[in-house]
Curated annotation (Swiss-Prot):
Quaternary assembly: Binds cAMP-dependent protein kinase (PKA). Interacts specifically with RII-regulatory subunits of PKA (PRKAR2A and PRKAR2B).
A molecular function (GO) term: protein kinase A binding
InterPro entries linked: AKAP7_RI-RII-bd_dom (IPR019511)
GO BP terms: negative regulation of protein-containing complex assembly; protein localization; protein-containing complex assembly
Biological role: Protein kinase A (PKA)-binding protein. Binds to type II regulatory subunits of protein kinase A (PKA) and may block the A-kinase anchoring protein (AKAP)-mediated subcellular localization of PKA.
Annotated domain remarks: The RII-alpha binding site, predicted to form an amphipathic helix, could participate in protein-protein interactions with a complementary surface on the R-subunit dimer.
Effect on the protein upon substituting I25P: Reduces binding to RII subunits of PKA
Name of encoding gene: AKAIN1
Organism: Homo sapiens
Protein name: A-kinase anchor protein inhibitor 1
């Protein structure tokens, strides 16, 4: 292997360590972002489901009022 001026053969393992650490940081950031999006999607679905339940209750009440007339 040919080294540039001022570069020492012992630097390569340190560079590999830094590259591996960088890869791990990126992987962790991606994983965290995916988990966050997943949680937000789940919360959104729960809110939509809750809203549907409220709408159905409202329709049921309207139907009962209409039947009484």
């Amino acid at each position: 292997m040919v080294f540039a001026p001022g570069e020492k053969p012992g630097n390569e393992p340190e560079e590999v360590k830094l590259q591996n650490a960088s890869k791990q940081i990126v992987q962790n950031a991606i994983l965290q972002a995916v988990q966050q999006v997943s949680q937000e999607s789940q919360r959104r679905e729960e809110r939509i489901s809750d809203n549907r339940d409220h709408i159905q209750l409202g329709v049921g009440e309207l139907t009962k009022k209409h039947e009484k007339k």
